[in-house]
Structures are given as structure tokens and as C-alpha cells.
Amino acid sequence: MEIVRNGIKCCLAWPPNYVLIFGEFYHFKCRRSVITYDWSNLVGADEFLCAVGYAHPNYREPDPDFDPFVMYCSSNKMLALDTVTDELYIIAESPAHFCSIGLRNFPPFARIELDIELDRLWYGETKCSGEEFVLLQKNIPALKNFVNRQCGQKIRIDAFQNFDLSFCSSNDIHYITGSGILEKILRRKYVVIGTCARCQVEPNCRAVILLGPNFHIYVYCDNKINKVARSIREFIRRGFEELLYKERYALNWHDDSLIYVSESEAENLNRMLNGESPILRKKPRHMYPRCDRYVKIKVLLFGILYTILLLMVPWMFFFRLLKNMPSILFAVHSSEISNPLVQSVTKFLHPIIIPNGDTELKYIVPVTESRLINGLQASAAGRFGIKGLRLCSDGVIWNRLIDYEYEMFKYPSTFTRADKFLLQLRDLKFMEDFDPKWQCITKLAAVGFYSGASLFNLGAKPGIGYWCRYLCEYLSMLFFKLDGKLKELSKESKQKLGGFSCAFWSESFKTEMQNKTESFFRRDFFDRFQLYLLEHFLLFCGCEECRYNFFRFKNVGTMKKNPGSVKLHFFPALGKIDLPIFPHLSEKYSNLSMFVAKDLCLSFIEGQIEHSRFPISVTVDMGQDKRNLLNILSNIVFLLFIIQTLNSVLFTELKMYYDVYLDELKNLESSMECEMKLGSKGCMNNIVYFNMLKQVKDIVRNPGTSSNFIFNCLEVIKMSFEIPYYKNYDETNFMESFYLHHLYIQRQPAKHTDLVAANNLAPGFFIVNAKEKSFIDVLERSIVNIEAEYLSNTKNINGAMALFFSGLKYFGNFGNGNFQTSPEKDVRAVGYKLGGLDKIQNDLCYFANVETLACVGVDASDGNE
């Protein structure tokens, strides 16, 4: 590559007002040579570099000892030289890529200090110039105080990606993937500064960001600590680009401070965060200062001995017990002591005076306005607008909806299905001051949100409709392969079929196979393929098992033979379903019925796809061409069975939700008419209310069908939320019970899995500002009718899904390797807590609960103080 005309300038895509001037080093009177950098570890042994030119601001000439010099590599990559440090960086994958991004991937630009205007011009919403957070990088005590003050606040990370950093400290985190790992990290002198993630991610799924002992920025992810940037400023501007850059080109940081955690050390937090752990006590274990069980045993033995010695002085022993009891203090900053929201919590506490010189570590729970506002996102009332429920019922509904909002799992069987959800809906408990006639609004909202997310959102992986589309595309690919396998049949195989194959695979039948909408969900279409599979086994094999299966199915029409019928664990309301007949199935598929009952084999199918294998393989001694054809037919029958069973579950659930929707819709109409007749304040003369009633009556007369009722349901929900009583309902009592419970002031018992899960997840919503777009607005943009055209992916096509399976047409094998499944991934990796052991600070006001006031060992002030 040779530069034809030196001195030509062209504008760069980034930074703004930068240009690239072409020329060799010597054209700019620089003594460097491109050949020198051919020995860089970024350049392969058989590669070479060519000069391109200097990048510099347009208002001045290039500075050879300051501005970056751009080079081209023979492997088509673009590189840039930092002329200050003499380091070489890969900045683009190709010249075209370089033209589109400019010098975005040039790390030294992210480290320089810019004035406020230029910083905004270069990096948009990210702020670094003069920011306190950036300036405190090497002042660890001040940085910790800053993080504690800003806990719950977010800042934008990465000017070119949608990341955010939420401030929090090690006192706000209970576990990172497992017990003891956080302590191990802190012992290595790392400092927790927050958690980071893309937007619309649950707080418990965020990655922990750390400041290392060398003042570099690290991230804890996938059971290891990785360096992401050399400074806070660079991390704010570039995010994780440096880490991705190192991994992409297999480069090392040469950093001995990296930590790797073994899988045995990393526990699965999902069991705790999903509510499967033992029931929480009145105070969780992390609120006890003495966490060493051996210390507790020694203290207990000492107490027994002390009891014997002080048997004549019982009051001294009682005082000793009180002094050793764990205490919780609630800290409020002096600037927020008069905040109404903070006062709604502190009115249940007693202010206390801390003696001067008290250096003992105490368990302190910060109470701030931002935390209390954030915390309401951990309730169905605050996040979804579903009002009137008691705390226990609110936690159940919130936990169910939050899983769907964040798409926490990938298989529908992991979520609660309609039968169990409607039982929970029936058992909802409402606040005593909530008018019973408006309970229908709460139930309508719960049914509408849950059914919309679980059934009508065909683009989300947790939905049943998504998997119908997924498997329909897979089945279409199998039909394509079937045509190829028929052409591969040998002359001897065709003679064995005796002309049957020609009659079977007629042009009309091929057209029917290609019509996904009309064929894939029909029972007779499945029965035909089941019969064709058995006929082909009879003609190719002809053993006793094949003859028995064929004539039994042909004459009796039953499929209870081999392997039998099963009942779906996740949806028993469907009853027992008969399994297809697969002659000569491999021995490793003996547990196939167990996987069908567990999750309809979805994890098994996806696991096989990930390893480029087809789900079903048969073991029969015959030619390869015949075995391939039988394998394809077996997989077609298997997928048709799964698709039609999913379809049955889908429409059974639709019917269940639709019946509840109709009942609650009629209840809403009656309640609104009653309110209108009684002439309650704000209704009789309210033309808006009258119009809403008219619209509800119209919807009652035309409620829609079970396959499209969600559209009317969401319209009714939005109108119902505007009804004066519901809109203006005073939630003070609920909010008080919510804060008292989650701040461990007045804990309510949690014996239900959903309540335990809600209790474990809620601290993360207090600490991380998780307020997102309105759930109902997001739902309205993603729902579609439940029709065969949508379920078969022939209407509103998921292009990525179709492209994926079209690429698999020429790949795949049968029966090689072990039986593979794709289990649910453990996406929740951070467990939060609302306080930690800390020292008393002078600028904070402290409060104590009435129950533990005597345990603090300090004086209680009167109300005036």
C-alpha cells in the first residue's frame, strides 16, 4: 500500500472536528519508521504495516510527537500509534469500519482531561470533567464516603453503549455468587464502588465494579475479576471496550492482581433469590455482628457459667444478656431529617444519642429519600400500579410479574402457569380500607399483565408462543432436509419402498408441508406422519416390534404403547397426554418421558441444537441412507408432537384467563354503575367518568375472543387506573407496612416461596434505581393476536429466528455424543442487603427500634431531641 498524494485531508467520524492527513512519518519531519512497529505483538509474523497519516484537530497542523498516527495492516486491520507513549492499538477491523467509527477505540483519548464543553461534544451524556467521583480515584477514604452518599444514584457509562453505573458499597452487598467471595475480594484491598449493567436489567443481575489496589477499575463477572480500565475516567467514557479488546485479540494485562474463583467456591444464588432457601428469620443472618458459630458457642458456655456464678444477682446477668444482643441502628443524614418520606419511617423509631468516643462497630441501616423512593419499585403498587393489596399478596403478584418483565428464565415451564397463578389470584388479601367493589380492577390488572407477558408476547423467550415459532422454523428446516434424504435413497431402498414413497411424497403433500399455518397445528397432520413413520419402519426393518407398532396404530389408533402417557409437571391441568411411538429408539432416550413431563423437552431440544445434533436418533441395523430417512421422520414426528402440545397448553391457558377476564369485567361494570347511581363525589357530574363507563359497557358487549382479549383488557386496565377512587386511593398504610417490613423494623412472617423471593430481591431495588418504562406501555408494543399465522412465524416474522434455522439446513448429525440439555442459566449473581457493620459518624442522626432500644447501650433522647 502506497500513499499517492501526501497532505490530503479527510474528516474523521470521531472525534468531532478531527481530520486525517495522509503521509509517511518523514513527510512530517518525524524520525520514526513504520518498519519499527512490524515487530509489535499486534502484528502477525507474516503481516506488515503501512503508513496512513496523522489524526489531528482541523484548526491546527499535526504535532508528530503528540497526535496519533494511523496505520494499515496487511490483515486488513487499522491501527493507531500513541506517539506520546509509543504504544500501538488496534482501532478498527477494516478500513470501512475505521471510516464509520473514527478513533473511538483509541484508548488514550479516553484518559485525557477535557473542558466541560469539549467533554460534552466528545462523550455526550457521560460526565468526567471536574467530577468529584473522577478526582477521588486515589483518595480511598473520601471515595468510600462519596459512594455511601451517592448510594442508589446512577450515572451513564460508555458514551457509545447503553450502560449505567449504580453506586453502592460493600456494606450494601450480601453475596457475590456465593458466601465468602466478597470477603475474599475485600481482603485483597479491592473497594466496591457500584454495580454496572445495560438498561432494563434486574438489580440482582448486575456486575460488581471494583477499584483495585493499583487504582485501576475491575469487574467481577463469571466467577473472576477482570480489569476493564486504568482509570475511572476511562471506564466512564469507554465502559467495557478495553476488556473486550483484550479478549478479542488474546492480549494480557500483565496484572498479578486478578482473582479467579473456583466453581466449588461460587454457590448458586438463584436458590436463595428465587425463594427456595429456608424461610428468613425476623432478622437475617447478616444482621448479627457475631457471625462465627464457634464464637457463639463459647459465648453460650460462658453465659451458662456466668449464670451459676451470678445466681444471686439475676439483674446483672440480665443486663449482660442485653448488652450482647445484636442491635440495629438506622442512620439518617442531618439534611434529610425533616424529609416527609424519611419521617414516615422514623416516626416508628426512637432517636438516640451516641456517646462521644464510641468506636464499636454497629450494624447500621441507612435511611435516605432516594432509597425509599427506589424501594417502592419492589412492590406491585409502586411498579405496576396494582393497588389495594396487603403486603403478602402484593409480594406474590410483584414476584410473578417481575420475572416476566426482566425475562429471568428462558423456558415457559420455569414460570408459574395459569392454573397456579389463578389460584393465587383467588387467594389475594386486600387492605381493610380498600373498597371491595374495586377489587376487580386489581384482579383485572394482574390477569392482563400476566397473561399478556406469558402468552401474547411472542417475541420474548419466556412466552409459549415464542417456542411455537421457534419449533415451527425448526420443523420447516427438517422438511427441507427430508426432501434431500429422499433423493439420497439408493436403488435398493427405493425398491423396498415399492412405490410407496412416490405416492407419499406427492407434490400436493409437499405443498401442504410447506404451509406451516394450515398444517403444523392439525392433529390429522401429526397422525399421518406418525403412520408414515411406522410404515417406513415396517418396510425398511420389518421386525416384530415394527409390525406390532404399525398394525396396532393402524387398527386401534392408540399411542399408549411405547413409551406411554405422561402428565406435564408444570401444567397438570392439561391432563395426561399420549406420547408418539418411536421404534428402535436409542437406549439413552429411556428418560424421554421424564423430559417431556418436566418442560416438554425444550431444554433437551435446545441443548441438542447447541451441539449441532438432532433431538431423536434411532438404532437399527440397516444402510445409512435408510437410517437417515428414519431419523428425519422420527424428528418430524417428535417436533409435531411438541408443537401441538405447546399449542394445547397455550389455548387451555387462554381459556382460563379469558373466563376470569369476563367475570371481572362484569364486576367492574356493576361497580361503576353502582358508583354512578350513588353519586359519589367526583363521579355523578364527571363527564370523563361517564365516558369511561360507556366504553366499559361497549367492551362488555364485545369482549373479544380468547385469542385477542388482551387488547380490550389493557384498554380497560388503563381506564380503571383513572377511576377517581382507585387513582386517589391513599396508600399510606401499605407504604408504612412495606417499609417497616423490608427495613426490619416490624417484620411480617413469610412462609410462601414467592414472599421469601420478594424479601430476598427487594434490597436490590432499594439500592439500585430500577425505575423503567411503564410495563403496560411496553406490553402494548409487544403483544399480538394468538393466531396460527403468528405462531408459525409466517406473519410478523422473527427474521433472526428464520435466518438461524435456514443456516442449519446443511448441518446436524444424529446420535453422536452424549445426551445434551441446555439448563436454565444462573443469571442472578448479586445478593444485596440494606446495611452493614460500620462506625458511628458525626454528621448522621441515629434511630433505634423500640424492641432493640435497650440493646444499644446508649441513651434514648426525648421527642424534642
From Swiss-Prot:
It holds the Pfam family US22. Belongs to the herpesviridae U4 family. This is Protein U5. It comes from Human herpesvirus 7 (strain JI) (HHV-7). The lineage of its organism: Viruses, Duplodnaviria, Heunggongvirae, Peploviricota, Herviviricetes.
